[in-house]
Amino acid sequence: MSSVTLRNVSKAYGETIISKNINLEIQEGEF
Protein backbone atom coordinates (compact mmCIF):
# COMPACT_ATOMS: atom_id res chain seq x y z
CA MET A 1 0.00 0.00 0.00
CA SER A 2 1.06 3.62 0.34
CA SER A 3 1.04 6.56 2.69
CA VAL A 4 0.77 10.34 2.29
CA THR A 5 3.02 12.88 4.05
CA LEU A 6 2.84 16.66 3.69
CA ARG A 7 5.38 18.80 5.57
CA ASN A 8 5.55 22.56 6.05
CA VAL A 9 2.76 23.30 3.56
CA SER A 10 1.70 26.94 3.35
CA LYS A 11 -0.94 28.72 1.27
CA ALA A 12 -1.30 32.43 0.59
CA TYR A 13 -3.48 34.59 -1.62
CA GLY A 14 -1.38 37.62 -2.45
CA GLU A 15 -0.07 38.88 0.90
CA THR A 16 -2.81 37.13 2.93
CA ILE A 17 -1.52 33.94 4.53
CA ILE A 18 -4.28 31.33 4.78
CA SER A 19 -2.26 28.52 6.38
CA LYS A 20 1.36 28.29 7.46
CA ASN A 21 3.60 25.27 8.05
CA ILE A 22 0.84 22.63 8.10
CA ASN A 23 1.97 19.01 8.56
CA LEU A 24 -0.19 15.99 7.68
CA GLU A 25 0.69 12.32 7.80
CA ILE A 26 -1.73 9.58 6.72
CA GLN A 27 -0.47 6.06 7.33
CA GLU A 28 -1.11 3.01 5.20
CA GLY A 29 -4.70 1.80 5.60
CA GLU A 30 -6.06 5.12 6.98
CA PHE A 31 -7.52 6.26 3.65
Swiss-Prot record:
Catalytic reaction equation(s): D-maltose(out) + ATP + H2O = D-maltose(in) + ADP + phosphate + H(+)
Q: What is this protein called?
A: Maltose/maltodextrin import ATP-binding protein MalK
The organism encoding this protein is: Photorhabdus luminescens
Q: Name one GO cellular component term.
A: plasma membrane
Q: Name one GO molecular function term.
A: ABC-type maltose transporter activity
Record family assignment: Belongs to the ABC transporter superfamily. Maltooligosaccharide importer (TC 3.A.1.1.1) family.
**How does the protein's chain sit in the membrane according to the entry?**
Peripheral membrane protein
**Where does this polypeptide localize?**
Cell inner membrane
Keywords, sorted A to Z: ATP-binding, Cell inner membrane, Cell membrane, Membrane, Nucleotide-binding, Sugar transport, Translocase, Transport
Gene symbol? malK
- Tell me the organism's taxonomic lineage: Bacteria, Pseudomonadati, Pseudomonadota, Gammaproteobacteria, Enterobacterales
Please state the Enzyme Commission number of this protein: 7.5.2.1
Q: What does this protein do?
A: Part of the ABC transporter complex MalEFGK involved in maltose/maltodextrin import. Responsible for energy coupling to the transport system.
Predominant place of localization: membrane
Domain of life assignment: Bacteria
- Self-association or partners: how does it assemble? The complex is composed of two ATP-binding proteins (MalK), two transmembrane proteins (MalG and MalK) and a solute-binding protein (MalE).
